[in-house]
Amino acid sequence: MLSRLFRMHGLFVASHPWEVIVGTVTLTICMMSMNMFTGNNKICGWNYECPKFEEDVLSSDIIILTITRCIAILYIYFQFQNLRQLGSKYILGIAGLFTIFSSFVFSTVVIHFLDKELTGLNEALPFFLLLIDLSRASTLAKFALSSNSQDEVRENIARGMAILGPTFTLDALVECLVIGVGTMSGVRQLEIMCCFGCMSVLANYFVFMTFFPACVSLVLELSRESREGRPIWLLSHFARVLEEEENKPNPVTQRVKMIMSLGLVLVHAHSRWIADPSPQNSTADTSKVSLGLDENVSKRIEPSVSLWQFYLSKMISMDIEQVITLSLALLLAVKYIFFEQTETESTLSLKNPITSPVVTQKKVPDDCCRREPMLVRNNQKCDSVEEETGINRERKVEVIKPLVAETDTPNRATFVVGNSSLLDTSSVLVTQEPEIELPREPRPNEECLQILGNAEKGAKFLSDAEIIQLVIAKHIPAYKLETLMETHERGVSIRRQLLSKKLSEPSSLQYLPYRDYNYSLVMGACCENVIGYMPIPVGVAGPLCLDGKEFQVPMATTEGCLVASTNRGCRAIGLGGGASSRVLADGMTRGPVVRLPRACDSAEVKAWLETSEGFAVIKEAFDSTSRFARLRKLHTSIAGRNLYIRFQSRSGDAMGMNMISKGTEKALSKLHEYFPEMQILAVSGNYCTDKKPAAINWIEGRGKSAVCEAVIPAKVVREVLKTTTEAMIEVNINKNLVGSAMAGSIGGYNAHAANIVTAIYIACGQDAAQNVGSSNCITLMEASGPTNEDLYISCTMPSIEIGTVGGGTNLLPQQACLQMLGVQGACKDNPGENARQLARIVCGTVMAGELSLMAALAAGHLVKSHMIHNRSKINLQDLQGACTKKTA
């Protein structure tokens, strides 16, 4: 129950950061102004002489107070160093500084508002600083920084508040009760310090629950564009959030704290209300005397300066101990900001992260990516490590050492993500991480858990064997390895080691690469339980002359002859003057199924949806879910009591499935308000239809509907395609039209459209499974020209499901392929134009592939070309583990 309340509170604070910050500041100013000139008018040193306060201070007291202040400043300094573990000393340092400053101001305002004595503030300031604990702020920031988007930032802050809120509340209560015992001591200085301490704890609690999460949410929101549109917190060293179960408090400790709180409440009640024998008036008089406020002791004087000048002079005038304290604070601040770990600051500067190759420690080197010895700082030799076979052998002492980027890399197999032309290979990147010696044998799980939960240490202080040990013991979920490790790559490496032990052939993963890949773009977006990446050859076909422009089309495939054949088709189209294309329709669909009590009720709902009034109501609800989604059409069908509704809407440059699904849910909720007896069976009732052959996609269309045409001169048909127009038309009729009809095909009136569609989809980060519907195509050929010797060809594709934002298009290699075509990302001037342009390119490339394959079939070259170009010449018996070798 409490966790749910704190979660709701955290979500509200993170979702409205400006309102919370402005409200907190306004409340502070209001409390200060309400009491500044309307409270107690007796101000010692300005309009009253207070002899009680003119006491001689021993030199030993001054020394002790100065030492205490310096310790408090050093404590705060080390707290800020802990915040550096999150990666950015500026973002979190400012947030921590705001927390400290706001807590101090709020404490001062509260005490002033309650008319308390402030003469003990000088002595109590170190006590206040020592009460500040930024560990919880650091933990909450970790939750926020493990996010991939601003929406996830809010959710993670809410989740962090749900976990940390109850614990922090109980701790604040216990601290107040413990410190509050000092207010009953009868010693004036101790009472003032303890009173101030209680106020500080409450102020820290207030700021942590309101100001700090709002500030973190706002800072991350403002910095979301600092890395070319990608959130700055996507860096690997920002994603070190701990497992939720590890953050949850120990129930035994919580029960002890609650029992302690109850006991302290009884102590306070007995001391203040039951055991106090003094009359009320006597108590009041005594308190006045003890605080130096007695009328007979204080003497009124005429102020010589105004009140603000009096306060300003008090702030400016400093003793020698205050000078020492201020000097130490300034020295540490300058050291922290300008001279400490400049390398860390440079790696987090607002430059393109792609231009700086990430140098990380390779835990278990793979032969497939790095075959040369690795260089180590100080000319230290790397220990030879065994291959990733999953077989446990006696481990030597592991040493995590910083690497140097090699400048001489002959015969080096690497995988570079991003714009390699921007890389400066002559620069030497050296991390300043100290060497960490790890034990020979894995330590106990309890010790490993403590190290993992330590903000100053973390997973990098644990060996791979210890991490594997924690995973096997269920202390770390295997699916969260990337999140918990200091780098995503190490998490993938450990998962591979875990998997290798379970495989019949432990060396199976040897040639599946995993290094030098930006997994931060994969996590939470593209794939789970990652064990590497699949390098697929990418060829280029072109130039494709389409609508007066030339395109070099990337195609990822392992089928020989496909790119070459498509390239020949592009050449033929170019020699014929190019192709023309149009987008006929644009609308992604989602087809939910609902059920009503009777078939007649379903008919009534269907009739209502087909009215202009019903459509307007549903459209308003649907369109409210997105600034791009605009409902264009409803197609309904009935099967008994079931009603199938096909929502069709534009989705901008996104493929649009998630966007349309969100709008569909909202529209169904609105429909349920009008027909309460309606039951929603599924948001997808296969009436869309997605990733399945369906006549409705072929007839009604889905995604982008495109058509492309070209005229190929007879000379080009003879010299480039090596056939005749009559032969190609004859094959097209009997193969693509009659043959497909005999097979009962739906949308398969083509030679091999799926080949080209899938190759482009894989290269450009599309959903490869959607080639089922996207490959719907009819290829038509006719004789044209004055002598009917030229070839007219057209391809019509009614359901190209494609997008240029979201999903796999966020990965850098896929973005590179989209940039080749000039359609990467969203079109700012005309939303959706990039996706439509990509659909036209797909249709034009399909036509090029159709042209070349049909020519090969007409000329009888298909089998011959595949025998030459599509058969491996490697002797499989020479390969280790080949089936032919084993059976021989």
Swiss-Prot record:
The active site is at 559 (charge relay system), 691 (charge relay system), 767 (charge relay system), 866 (proton donor). Glycans are attached at residues 281, 296. A motif (INSIG-binding motif) lies at residues 75-78. Regulated by a negative feedback mechanism through sterols and non-sterol metabolites derived from mevalonate. Phosphorylation at Ser-872 down-regulates the catalytic activity. Pathway: Metabolic intermediate biosynthesis; (R)-mevalonate biosynthesis; (R)-mevalonate from acetyl-CoA: step 3/3. The modification Phosphoserine is found at residue 872. Residues 61-218 form the SSD domain. The chain crosses the membrane at residues 10-39, 57-78, 90-114, 124-149, 160-187, 192-220, 249-275, 315-339. Undergoes sterol-mediated ubiquitination and ER-associated degradation (ERAD). Accumulation of sterols in the endoplasmic reticulum (ER) membrane, triggers binding of the reductase to the ER membrane protein INSIG1 or INSIG2. The INSIG1 binding leads to the recruitment of the ubiquitin ligase, AMFR/gp78, RNF139 or RNF145, initiating ubiquitination of the reductase. The ubiquitinated reductase is then extracted from the ER membrane and delivered to cytosolic 26S proteosomes by a mechanism probably mediated by the ATPase Valosin-containing protein VCP/p97. N-glycosylated. Deglycosylated by NGLY1 on release from the endoplasmic reticulum (ER) in a sterol-mediated manner. One of its GO terms (biological process) is coenzyme A metabolic process. GO terms for cellular component: endoplasmic reticulum; endoplasmic reticulum membrane; peroxisomal membrane. There is a cross-link at residues 89, 248 (Glycyl lysine isopeptide (Lys-Gly) (interchain with G-Cter in ubiquitin)). Pfam families: HMG-CoA_red (PF00368), Sterol-sensing (PF12349). Gene3D superfamilies: 3-hydroxy-3-methylglutaryl-coenzyme A Reductase, Chain A, domain 2, HMGR, N-terminal domain, Hydroxymethylglutaryl-CoA reductase, class I/II, NAD/NADP-binding domain. Catalyzes the conversion of (3S)-hydroxy-3-methylglutaryl-CoA (HMG-CoA) to mevalonic acid, the rate-limiting step in the synthesis of cholesterol and other isoprenoids, thus plays a critical role in cellular cholesterol homeostasis. This is 3-hydroxy-3-methylglutaryl-coenzyme A reductase.
